[in-house]
Regions:
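Short alpha-helical oligomerization interface
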Residues: 88-101
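C-terminal helical subdomain
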Residues: 173, 185-223
Length: 241
């Protein structure tokens, strides 16, 4: 029996991934801040889903995760879908700091907890949703793009650490483009993808234990050309949504 814990499963990509894993026979633990949404999803497959209210910015979240793992009966896959982001060209401090609190502090808190759990087992799979926004610094969303770059680098560092310690821990860094979720409530975004379609690509990548996946093919082209742009030119480009 395969077991997964999904953090940030109350909506969007996390919720859709949870549904697909249940269809594939996984037993899953879903966690997030909105208990009502968790209960609604649990009702669709009560024999396969357990729930836990959890906020990644809470210092006690790792302790809750440990309890949740025991409640599920173990964990083979840790999937982190919790994150926030906003355009903030005016650099409002509360937006920048809230973004880093969730996407850096909360991310680090949960991923290190999962790593340490799998370290005791000697194996496991850690997957996290970052973004193509981590490819370059985005002037319209400084904290968001910077925190996503942090996530890319942190996962890379843990992958190296896992090998150094001779652990059989797999890592999947999921980098989608624009997805129609609660994060994109305002503004007009090009090439907008639906969460259920993105989730299908993610589950396929998880089953294959892919190290990095950019979703979808259009955004793979975008990222390819972004990487070719030199810094002096990038900083002069008026990047907008």
């Amino acid at each position: 029996m395969k077991r997964a814990i999904i953090i940030g499963a109350t909506s969007g990509i996390g919720e859709e991934v949870a549904k697909l894993l249940v269809q594939q026979g996984w037993h899953i633990g879903i966690a997030g801040r909105r208990e009502e949404a968790l209960e609604k999803l649990q009702a669709t497959a009560p024999g396969q889903i357990v729930i836990q209210r959890l906020d990644v910015t809470d210092p006690d979240a790792p302790t809750l995760l440990e309890t949740f793992i025991r409640k599920l009966g173990g964990m083979d896959l840790f999937f982190l879908s919790s994150g926030i982001g906003s355009q903030n060209p005016d650099l409002k401090p509360e937006i920048e700091l809230n973004t880093t609190r969730t996407n850096v502090e909360g991310f680090t808190r949960m991923v290190t907890s999962a790593f340490n759990y799998f370290k005791t087992r000697g194996e496991g799979h850690i997957a996290a949703i970052s973004s193509i926004a981590g490819t370059k610094g985005l002037g319209i969303a400084p904290a968001y793009s910077a925190t996503k770059r942090f996530q890319n680098t942190y996962i890379e560092a843990l992958a190296q650490l896992s090998r150094m310690q001779h652990l059989n821990i797999h890592f999947t860094d999921i980098r989608p483009g624009f997805v129609a979720t609660d994060l994109l409530k305002s503004g007009k975004f090009p090439m907008l993808m639906q969460a259920n379609q993105v989730a299908k690509s993610i589950v396929c990548a998880l089953n294959r234990k892919k190290r990095v996946i950019v979703i979808d093919s259009r955004y793979r082209v975008v990222v390819f050309f972004w990487r070719m742009i030199p810094r002096w030119l990038w900083e002069r480009l008026p990047i907008k949504n």
